[in-house]
Amino acid sequence: MSSRKQARLEAKNFIDSLSVQPYPNSKKAYIQGSREDIQVPVREISLADSLVGGTKKEPVFEPNVPIQVYDTSGVYTDPTHQIDLYSGLPKLREQWIDERGDTELLDDVSSVYTKERLEDETLDDLRYGNLPRIRRATDEQCVTQLHYARQGIITPEMEYIAIRENMGRQKFADEQLNHQHPGHNFGANLPKEITPEFVRKEVAEGRAIIPSNINHPESEPMIIGRNFLVKVNANIGNSSVSSSIEEEVEKLVWSTRWGGDTVMDLSTGRNIHETREWILRNSPVPIGTVPMYQALEKVNGVAEDLNWEVMRDTLIEQAEQGVDYFTIHAGLLLRYVPMTAKRVTGIVSRGGSIIAKWCLAHHQESFLYTHFREICEICAKYDVALSLGDGLRPGSIADANDEAQFSELRTLGELTKVAWEYDVQVIIEGPGHVPMHLIKENMDEQLEHCHEAPFYTLGPLTTDIAPGYDHITSGIGAAMIGWYGCAMLCYVTPKEHLGLPNKEDVKTGLITYKLAAHAADLAKGHPGAQIRDNALSKARFEFRWEDQFNLALDPETARSFHDETLPQESGKVAHFCSMCGPKFCSMKISQEVREYAKDTEQVAADQAIEIKMLDNPLEGMRQKSQEFRDTGSELYHPAVGAKEAQLEE
């Protein structure tokens, strides 16, 4: 069997046998909102008790409160839910949308292409079988979260997000857990508690978006903005030479498990429409696309043959399926193309290269630019957010921050204002390949020229010399630009520049970028960001190995690395690891020092000797030397109670 057939078979088996898979020692918990149907998911990590004293026979323990963390995995980690990918996810937002009374259910699809696909009987085996009815705004209505926010309306989505962003941190009274270093937020507004009104205000001002197509009611509301937690996007999608529908659905579920806040379906191969339907019906997170890719397939891959009619039908097709945000490369103007002639790597964006080729072939501005207002009208009817694409992003360090890149950025700022006229939500896409010392300039330019609309960047990669490790080269840049104010980071996998990522590459990219996003939240001083770090550090100091694993971003890898050298169960309670061994563990020695300091009698004796040393230095040193030998010539001595408790080892 070929490797491709094997991969598809494995993915199909995954789909057919998918069951709830909670994280180790974690449970899905829900925080109740103001109404019965606002139940916000968090992952609650249970921790072992801390040994604080006593004896071997009667040890004294202190409980550790469970840690709640942001959870993107949907019902896939909820044991009360029966997983069935053929039926899709619960329609969480359907009632909220219906209650607003500004949408209608359509009797038929509006897209010509969708009608053709539905009438093609050869696609029956591929098609998602439980197609929902399509919603659209009623005449003269706008159904975007930005529109509601500007009207002063706090939607259920906004309340849901406020609860989600706080992650239940209000319940932590432990001073040690709540300790947090002051951050440097570069002008961001980070309140101690996120309220629904704060969410509404940020959305109304255009500083944040809530991607929430009315035809994707399965999605759990989330927010993208620099005054909130930094988010991470995962890219999936087939190509003309690799992957299948089953594999892409598998990657979707995998992405949400490992922290993908949104997922972009960048499919360019066969059956794009059917693949996207399966993904949307089973996605608890917002889904983004680049409609240009599918439009190009419709004209057999000939960029010059693209036109507004094909693009318009594609936008409607995808909006009615439920796509939450479109990447639109409308800021690439004809006069910017010559600016790329002297670049080392030219135009590296797929969408950008398609538009550039079309502009040159027709010697006019692209239909995305000339029909931009019509694009906004379509988006307003379904609440599709616009992710204004950076078609001229630098593809190499040499091309960073050049005239072409920043010219397009300024045009994106102009288009942002146009979209806001229609109450359409907007984020701005950014680079790319940028050395560390030029990254902040990108953030500063974006804030100035794009009116504080959220920034969404691919990395940036900080060096070009590490194919196979570009998740690391870009993770460095992602952490930096997240700190400076970038709202969402698009992950990069180890396969970047080399091939289509598989399931494990997706996980590696996501863990790397969740790490970068969290580091940025810490640096900004986002309230409560340090709680998980503090809990893990406490577990590490107390040798609670299982708690260390379970609090990690990737518990499986942390546990497997530990067990490579200490696989026995006794290794899970040992007061050392294989790095230093039992005699040289700094944590163990520090514990012994701490216990030693608690011995008040010894402290008093030390003080007496110190006085004697001042009176008679030679006699004092002789006594200290004799004391060291008399107590076994050991560097550190734990208190008696602690030593007895550790005899269990």
Swiss-Prot record:
Belongs to the ThiC family. InterPro entries: ThiC, ThiC-associated_dom, ThiC/Bza_core_dom, ThiC/BzaA/B. GO terms for molecular function: 4 iron, 4 sulfur cluster binding; carbon-carbon lyase activity; zinc ion binding. It holds the Pfam family ThiC_Rad_SAM. HAMAP family: ThiC. PANTHER family: PHOSPHOMETHYLPYRIMIDINE SYNTHASE, CHLOROPLASTIC, THIAMINE BIOSYNTHESIS PROTEIN THIC. Substrate binds at N235, M264, Y293, H329, S349, R350, G351, D390, G391, L392, R393, E429, Y456. One of its GO terms (cellular component) is cytosol. The gene is thiC. Its EC number is 4.1.99.17. Signal peptide: none annotated. It is an enzyme of class 4 (lyase). This is Phosphomethylpyrimidine synthase. Pathway: Cofactor biosynthesis; thiamine diphosphate biosynthesis. Its cofactor is [4Fe-4S] cluster. [4Fe-4S] cluster binds at C577, C580, C585. Residues 621-632 have a biased composition (Basic and acidic residues). It catalyses: 5-amino-1-(5-phospho-beta-D-ribosyl)imidazole + S-adenosyl-L-methionine = 4-amino-2-methyl-5-(phosphooxymethyl)pyrimidine + CO + 5'-deoxyadenosine + formate + L-methionine + 3 H(+). Homodimer. Binds 1 [4Fe-4S] cluster per subunit. The cluster is coordinated with 3 cysteines and an exchangeable S-adenosyl-L-methionine. One of its GO terms (biological process) is thiamine biosynthetic process. It comes from Vibrio atlanticus (strain LGP32). It comes from the Bacteria.
